[in-house]
Amino acid sequence: MRIMGLDVGDKTIGVAVSDLMGWTAQGVATIRRSRLAADLEHLRELVKTYEVERIVCGLPRNMNGTYGPRAEGIRKFGSLVEKKLNIPVDYWDERLTTVAAQKTLIAGDLSRAKRKQVVDKLAAVLILQNYMDAKAHLAAKEQSKETSE
């Protein structure tokens, strides 16, 4: 099953997709946001192209674990995506993913201009990879529990 990860911002949406086995995430696009209908259509095309069966939206949380107004906006966007594209949407804690993406790009010695072009896509990769790793860990834990009983 292929999963899509989204880092939704006010100006751009970073997009990543998993491999068919759901092991690794790859960045595929940064959508420059315009109108909501255009954003949804662009996502629809990517869902179709990559045969995506589930979407994970990064959900911004405060460092104390609470949700702010941005999280509410992401949930509204995710609900629209789910309704209009007829695909399940999950949410994943995106705390510090953009910071981690920036640090990775700086360590890679990318120029500020190049970092700006790819940071949202890399943040989407981190959101999706963290989601898949957590799901794989839970599945392994469940399997281990079943075999020990």
Curated annotation (Swiss-Prot):
Keywords: Cytoplasm, Hydrolase, Nuclease, Ribosome biogenesis. It is an enzyme of class 3 (hydrolase). It is found in: Cytoplasm. GO terms for biological process: rRNA 5'-end processing. SMART domains: YqgFc. GO terms for cellular component: cytosol. GO terms for molecular function: nuclease activity. Its EC number is 3.1.-.-. NCBIfam families: RNAse_H_YqgF (TIGR00250). Belongs to the YqgF nuclease family. Could be a nuclease involved in processing of the 5'-end of pre-16S rRNA. This is Putative pre-16S rRNA nuclease. The lineage of its organism: Bacteria, Bacillati, Bacillota, Clostridia, Eubacteriales.
